Amino acid sequence: RYGDFDNGKIGISLESNEIIQIDAKSSEPVHFQIASRVRAICEENNVKPEHLAIDATGEGGGLCDILAKTWHPSIQRVELGGKASDRPVSPEDHRKSSEVYANKVTELWFSVRQWVINEQLRGMHHAAVIEFCSRMFDDEKRMTIIERKVDMKARTGKSPDFADAITLVVEMARRLGGYATANRLKGGLTSWDKMVRDCDSIYHDTFASV
């Protein structure tokens, strides 16, 4: 959920996570099982399709297509393997992310870092914390790049799936105008601010990621 924190900032509170179980005996294809459960979870928690961020890289693109057809085309596709955006690195660093980060996934992982450092991200699962702290990165070249997922999995024996899910939540917030900042926020100047100000402290429409 998203709302006003006691530190004067608007932040993200991670309240729950769910691992979708696949029924091997079902005649329904795996991706359709996942899509069905994702939609059910979103509807149970009042998450609108336009507030659902999904990793559209690789097989994720097929899942996006299914959800777009069976639920709504307004779901938010995120190409983790794509190019970094032209958004500023932060309110204090006006350089384009595409000038600093080698790819989108690096941009998103460092965006989470910004939100955590500025005390705007709370309730992170212990497993996700370990994943964020375990992934290596290289900032000695012209552009910063994080370790490839396949390399991290080979090195640690685990894929950073919990951490990737959190990056999608933060990306959803950023798409709505949310940003990490060292300063207290003074007014509703973005769609993100307005959404929170229009509600009683906590914004009851929630966001999700896959």
Residue locations for each model-derived region?
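Acidic two-metal-ion nuclease catalytic site recognized across multiple nuclease folds
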Residues: 135-149, 153-210
